[in-house]
């Protein structure tokens, strides 16, 4: 986990520089291996490292979640170099493991219990089914395969479970040695209950032990899957932190450009991850690219969510800024009004200041003016005194002439009345003069309007005559012509009526009106005929429109058919290209498989020939040994026959001697009795 933390805190270039290239091989040490297979594996590992370095250079400091996930999985699964364990260390490890196995040789699980076996088998079957064991291995699996297994079923299950723990491992030895060495390397706690002879025949009474071993591998795989899932979650959290950084508000155009560059880098990462995973799958001769495409779609959905969030944030920011802009505009308008008022007040202040200055300047002149006014008042007082003296003198003169003041006042009143009547007459004369002038102006305006009307009438009649002439109807222009006298505004023409003005020969009611009515009726008839023709043309126009509509519909249908045919052709072309590409890929894979099979067959043929030669030599040695042993057996048989014959002869002689002794003893006893 410390290694994972270091990987998360450093950039992809530092990680790739610090990674041991041997970690991308198997962590299980091999004593002997095929040189050709090792060279092939080293070539694949070199290619993988080159791809990883290329991805790291393109990604910069922010490595994508997919590549980090893959590198971390490889770091977890391939944490030990293949060549890191030497023979002495292997022997020490084996001795340590053997001591451990001897200490924990007893398996506490009730593997002989049928119910417990069913539980283990069901759990193993569920895990294999969930992880698509049958799809990956192309080997069917069922509960019957776990209850009554074959050697092939066990091999497929064991290889698949172990390769999930160590994807870089290559099975090269025989199954008995391979399984036993793998279990010893991964510290299977109950290895002492299994021996190599049992591995060569897993069925029968030994099967519960192997069910327990497979269940232990399933548990280890589940724990590893949980750890990797937790690691994926932590990496996704790191991606979420990048998303949070992208969702921060922007303040400058430079930040917007940086965010745009991050968006482009994210899209490049997504495609690079997809292409890299697909290429690795292609190198593994796998045709299923759907998981990588699904990951690409999910990544693009997250990317679209980021874009939508950014757009929503920019929209809200724009709305907020628009509200602020409106408030600023309103404040600016108020500020403008305030500035205008301030300008007006400043002008008023300047005007008042100027007035005050003028007043202050004039206030300096007031004492002189007051002095002049006082002098003027004194002068007027003196004049009044002189006038009063003159009045007194005139009064004394009138008394001497016997003229009273009442007569003077009466004469003044008469003079006033005469002046008033004169003023009244002059005012009435002015009124009459204004009325005459006004009437003359009105008459002139009426005369001008009449002349304008006559001009309009004349232009209208001329247009009517020309129009009727174009239609073939000749009208006498003099019959509808009106002419006014030239001296209409003279004083002799004042007070004439309309009939007197125009004359007895011409009247509005008789010939002109009749002619105009006749022309109007003719025009109405022509309008009616034109309307009927227009209605017919309208019907034809509607028919043409309907026909155009039907033609347009037919044209749209043909265009739709053309577009559908084009789309079908394009789909067929793309499908053909994809099929051709897939066929080429299959051909390349088959050629690669054929070449690999050819190489393997050559290797197998050479190994079989070598084994046949060794077997022939062994057969000859065995024949010689058989002949030698046959001679030895013949000698032994002859010796045994001789021994048996001698033993028989000796036995018979002993029996005869015993019989003779017995008879003698019997005779002796008989004689004594």
Curated annotation (Swiss-Prot):
Ordered alphabetically, the record's keywords are: Cell cycle, Cell division, Centromere, Chromosome, Coiled coil, Kinetochore, Mitosis, Nucleus
**Polar residues bias: start-end ranges:** 24-33
Q: Where is this region: Disordered?
A: 1-39, 60-111
Membrane-spanning segments: none
Q: Which GO CC annotations does the UniProt entry carry?
A: Ndc80 complex; nucleus
> Which residues pair up as cystines?
none
Alphabetical list of Pfam families matching this protein:
DUF5595, Ndc80_HEC
Q: Which GO terms describe its biological process?
A: cell division; mitotic sister chromatid biorientation
Where found, per UniProt?
Nucleus; Chromosome, Centromere, Kinetochore
Sequence ranges of Low complexity compositional bias: 64-80, 88-100
For whether the record's keyword set contains Cell membrane, the answer is: no
Q: Which GO terms describe its molecular function?
A: microtubule binding
Which family does the UniProt entry place this protein in? Belongs to the NDC80/HEC1 family.
Q: What is this protein called?
A: Probable kinetochore protein NDC80
Species per Swiss-Prot/TrEMBL record: Kluyveromyces lactis (strain ATCC 8585 / CBS 2359 / DSM 70799 / NBRC 1267 / NRRL Y-1140 / WM37) (Yeast)
The organism's lineage is: Eukaryota, Fungi, Dikarya, Ascomycota, Saccharomycotina
Gene designation per UniProt:
NDC80
């Amino acid at each position: 986990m410390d290694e994972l933390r270091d990987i998360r805190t450093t950039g992809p270039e530092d990680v790739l520089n610090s990674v041991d290239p041997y970690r991308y091989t198997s962590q299980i040490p091999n004593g002997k291996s095929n040189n050709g297979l090792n060279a092939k594996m080293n070539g694949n590992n070199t290619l993988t490292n080159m791809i990883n370095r290329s991805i790291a250079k393109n990604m910069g400091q922010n490595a994508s979640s997919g590549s980090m996930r893959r590198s971390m999985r490889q770091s977890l699964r391939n944490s030990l170099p293949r060549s890191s364990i030497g023979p002495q260390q292997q022997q020490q490890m084996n001795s340590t493991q053997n001591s451990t196995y001897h200490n924990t040789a007893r398996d506490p699980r009730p593997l002989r219990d049928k119910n417990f076996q069913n539980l283990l088998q069901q759990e193993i079957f569920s895990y294999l089914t969930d992880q698509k064991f049958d799809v990956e291995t192309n080997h069917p699996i069922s509960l019957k395969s776990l209850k009554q297994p074959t050697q092939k079923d066990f091999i497929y299950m064991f290889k698949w479970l172990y390769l999930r723990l160590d994807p870089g491992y290559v099975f090269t030895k025989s199954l008995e040695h391979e399984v036993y060495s793998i279990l010893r390397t991964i510290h299977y706690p109950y290895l002492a209950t299994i021996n190599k002879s049992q591995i060569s025949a897993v069925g029968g009474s030994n099967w519960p032990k192997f069910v327990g071993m497979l269940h232990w591998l399933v548990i280890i795989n589940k724990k590893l899957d949980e750890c990797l899932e937790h690691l994926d979650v932590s990496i996704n959290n790191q991606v979420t932190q990048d998303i949070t950084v992208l969702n921060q508000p922007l303040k400058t155009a430079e930040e917007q450009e940086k965010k745009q560059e991050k968006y482009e880098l994210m899209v490049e990462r997504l495609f690079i991850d997809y292409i890299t995973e697909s290429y690795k799958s292609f190198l593994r001769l796998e045709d299923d690219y759907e998981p990588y495409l699904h990951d690409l779609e999910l990544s693009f959905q997250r990317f679209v969510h980021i874009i939508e969030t950014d757009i929503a944030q920019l929209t809200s920011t724009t709305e907020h800024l628009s509200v602020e802009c409106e408030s600023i505009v309103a404040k600016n308008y108020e500020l403008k009004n305030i500035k205008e008022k301030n300008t007006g007040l400043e002008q008023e202040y300047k005007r008042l200041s100027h007035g005050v200055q003028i007043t202050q300047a004039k206030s300096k002149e007031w004492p002189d003016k007051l002095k002049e006014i006082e002098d003027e008042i004194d002068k007027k007082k003196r004049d009044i005194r002189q006038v009063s003296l003159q009045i007194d003198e005139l009064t004394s003169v009138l008394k001497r002439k016997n003229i009273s003041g009442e007569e003077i006042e009466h004469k003044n009143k008469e003079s006033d009345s005469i002046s008033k009547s004169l003023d009244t007459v002059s005012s009435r004369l002015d009124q009459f003069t204004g009325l005459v002038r006004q009437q003359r102006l009105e008459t002139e305006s009426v005369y001008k309007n009449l002349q304008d009307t006559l001009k309009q009438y004349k232009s209208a009649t001329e247009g009517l005559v020309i129009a009727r002439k174009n239609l073939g109807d000749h009208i006498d222009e003099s019959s509808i012509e009106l002419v006014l006298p030239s001296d209409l505004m003279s004083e002799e023409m004042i007070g004439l009526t309309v009939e007197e003005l125009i004359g007895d020969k011409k009247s509005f009611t008789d010939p002109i009106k009749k002619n105009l009515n006749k022309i109007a009726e003719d025009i109405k008839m022509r309008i009616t005929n034109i309307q009927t023709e227009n209605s017919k043309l309208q019907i034809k126009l509607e028919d043409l429109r309907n026909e155009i509509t039907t033609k347009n519909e037919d044209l749209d249908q043909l265009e739709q058919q053309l577009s559908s045919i084009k789309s079908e052709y394009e789909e067929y072309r793309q499908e053909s290209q994809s099929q051709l590409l897939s066929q080429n890929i299959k051909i390349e894979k088959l050629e690669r498989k054929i070449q690999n099979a050819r190489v393997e067959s050559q290797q197998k043929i050479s190994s079989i020939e070598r084994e046949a030669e060794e077997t022939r030599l062994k057969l000859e040695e065995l024949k010689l040994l058989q002949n030698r042993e046959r001679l030895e057996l013949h000698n032994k048989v002859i010796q045994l026959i001789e021994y048996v014959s001698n033993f028989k002869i000796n036995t018979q002689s002993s029996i005869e001697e015993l019989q003779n002794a017995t008879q003698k003893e019997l005779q002796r006893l008989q004689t004594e009795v």
